[in-house]
Structure formats: structure tokens, C-alpha cells
Amino acid sequence: MLNFKLLNTDGNARRGQLTVNHGVIETPIFMPVGTYGSVKAMSPLELKEIDAQIILGNTFHLWLRPGNDIVAKFGGLHEFMGWDKPILTDSGGFQVFSLGEMRKITEEGVHFSSPINGDKLFLSPEVSMQIQRVLNSDIVMQFDECTPYEIDGRPATADEAAKSMRMSLRWAKRSIDEFNREENPNALFGIVQGGMFEHLRDESLAGLEDINFHGVAIGGLSVGEPKEDMLRVLQHVGPRLPANKPHYLMGVGTPEDLVQGVANGIDMFDCVMPTRNARNGWLFTRFGDIKIKNARYKDDKKPLDASCGCYACRNFSRAYLHHLHRTGEILGARLNTIHNLHYYLDLMREMREAISEGRFQLFVKQFHADRARGA
């Protein structure tokens, strides 16, 4: 089940409301990544406290560990991980793409060796839909082939990107057929592929519109291409996505990427960047980024960001966070993660308000000025 209501627009930016089986999601929204059914360093309670409305789980990794049989005993991923709000699961396509030499792609699906124990495994549109049915995620992604930016050390040609994209379209049809056969009560999104080629992206989108998914995602970006190529494709595809459906930009990215995405009609984002960077001591703030391990912070009494209302900024100094990071204390990773995710989710809230009030362009201008100021 999925209902998408468009509440306001400001240029191409959209303010909406997405209703799925486990609740209502205010868009545009950022989805923290919980690869193994856990957002690293965060409890479900802490996620709710920073206003996370939906999280992402990883079909491929959850299939390998703990396995579908375990999750099935709990009635799905929500019950298994103790999270009662919406969940989106990716299809496993990107993870299989990331295996490189360990996998073989055929029309039927992908044969690969488990990165855990070397077992021979097979993932196809049908298998991906079956796994996601057991996970009972609110939003299911079609199984696709993520077109690589580079093949054999050079950018993929139009012919290579076309071949990959057309197979993803055939897999899209098989995905929705299996989704319907299983009478899955949740929502299914299609994925626009086509590499760096606008005409292939158009062909992919047209094919997905014929299949009629509940929502549509842009895949195959942030896979090693130059930033200008990513923006070119985003600016071409984003405004062409169907107005009555939610738009999801997969695996992207920096705060600047989120603002650029919203400006081009994107409603949903996910990325490991705020959580992974937090564990590495890279913190995002309204006024630029902070690398907390730098010695300049060892006696800095200021909070990370005086304008931030997160638990870390309300209670601790940069000096203390520097100390925790240098000593490898687990609390450091936790506080850093709370801060980064709070910053990302607060940025989305500010964009929702700006779109509702018809001042999104002013917001973008102020956002860039603040970020350039330096923390």
C-alpha cells in the first residue's frame, strides 16, 4: 500500500506526504542506512528522538545474515529489529554489482560466491522479491543491474550502458510480476538506469512508466563518476519523473547533494555518508565540515555547532569529542553519529518548511553561504 500526496511545489522542489503500511512520511526525507537491520551506533529509540521517519535495510546482507528463515520467524524485519516505523529495502542489485570478479551476470540473474563463506548463491528478480516479501518492508525495490561508470578502467560506452539498462527493464517486469504473484501488500519502486547517457535514461523511464510502479528511483549515480556528470544526469532525469509518484535518488550523498536533489524534484534519499563519516570523525555542520581528530580541537570548548539541537551539541565540547575519537571510545562514534544524522534530518525539515513557505531559492542561497563560512 502506498499513497503519495503532493502538498506544495516551489520550482521543481516538492513537499509531499507518503503513506505506507507502517506510517506517514513527510517528504523530502533522508533515510538512515541500517544495512544489517541496525543503523550503526544508533538504537531505534535514538532514531525516533532525532525524527527518523523511515530507515533502509539491505536485502543482500540480511539474506546472508541472519537469513530469511530467521527473519520469517519474527514476521518480518520490523519485529526482528524492534522498529515500528517504515522501512525501505534495496533489492541487492547494487551489492552484487559491488562484488566485481566474484559474480557472473546472466539474463536469468546473478550467480556469485558468498563473501562470508564462499557458498555458491543465485539472486534474480524473483528471489529478490521473495526475500523482500519475508522482510515485509514497506517499500520494496525492483531487482536491477547497477550500470557501472567504468568498465575495464574506462567509462562505459553507450552500447554497454544500453545493454545493462535494457536488462534492468526486463528484470523490472519480472520483479513486478513476482511481487504481484506473492500478493505483497507493500509498495514497489522501479529504478531508472542508463549510465551517463540522457537518451538511455529517457528510454529507461519510459519503460518503467509502462510497467506502472508505485514510485520511481534514480539508480546508477554516485558510482565513481565525476560530480558534474552526476549533476547533469540528475538535472535531466529529476524533473522528468512522473509528478504523481514519489522520486528516490539512491545512495546520494553530501548535504550539497541533498539540496541539489530536492531542487531537481527528488523526495527521498539514502546514503551511508553521515554514519560512516561519523565513525571516522568527519562531522557535518551548518557551517561546514569538522574533522574532529585534528589537534586544533583538543582544547576547543565550543559545541560542534551552536545552532544544532542534537544531544551531542547540547552537552559536549569539541575537545571532548576530539578526546573520545583519539582514544577510540565507542561513545565517540555514537555521539558523532547522533550529530550527523540529526544534521541531515534537520536539513530535510528545513527544506520541507522552505518549500511550504515558497522560499526554497532563498533557503538554497543561505545554505551555501553558511556552509562556505567554515566551522
Swiss-Prot record:
Keyword Transport attached: no
Cofactor: how and how many bound: Binds 1 zinc ion per subunit.
Positions contributing to substrate binding: D90, S91, G92, G93, F94, D144, Q193, G220
RNA binding: region residues: 251-257, 275-279
Catalytic-site annotation from UniProt: D90, D270
Pfam families: TGT (PF01702)
EC number of the protein: 2.4.2.29
GO function term, MF aspect, one: tRNA-guanosine(34) queuine transglycosylase activity
Co-factor(s): Zn(2+)
Superkingdom to which the source organism belongs: Bacteria
Catalysed reactions, as listed in the record: 7-aminomethyl-7-carbaguanine + guanosine(34) in tRNA = 7-aminomethyl-7-carbaguanosine(34) in tRNA + guanine
Residues the record lists as binding Zn(2+): C308, C310, C313, H339
Annotated transmembrane regions: none
GO biological process: queuosine biosynthetic process; tRNA wobble guanine modification; tRNA-guanine transglycosylation
UniProt key word Glycosyltransferase: yes
Keywords on record: Glycosyltransferase, Metal-binding, Queuosine biosynthesis, Transferase, tRNA processing, Zinc
GO CC, any one term: cytosol
Pathway terms, separated by semicolons: tRNA modification; tRNA-queuosine biosynthesis
Function: Catalyzes the base-exchange of a guanine (G) residue with the queuine precursor 7-aminomethyl-7-deazaguanine (PreQ1) at position 34 (anticodon wobble position) in tRNAs with GU(N) anticodons (tRNA-Asp, -Asn, -His and -Tyr). Catalysis occurs through a double-displacement mechanism. The nucleophile active site attacks the C1' of nucleotide 34 to detach the guanine base from the RNA, forming a covalent enzyme-RNA intermediate. The proton acceptor active site deprotonates the incoming PreQ1, allowing a nucleophilic attack on the C1' of the ribose to form the product.
HAMAP family: Q_tRNA_Tgt
Subunit structure: Homodimer. Within each dimer, one monomer is responsible for RNA recognition and catalysis, while the other monomer binds to the replacement base PreQ1.
UniProt xrefs under NCBIfam families: Q_tRNA_tgt, tgt_general
Family from the record: Belongs to the queuine tRNA-ribosyltransferase family.
Full protein name: Queuine tRNA-ribosyltransferase
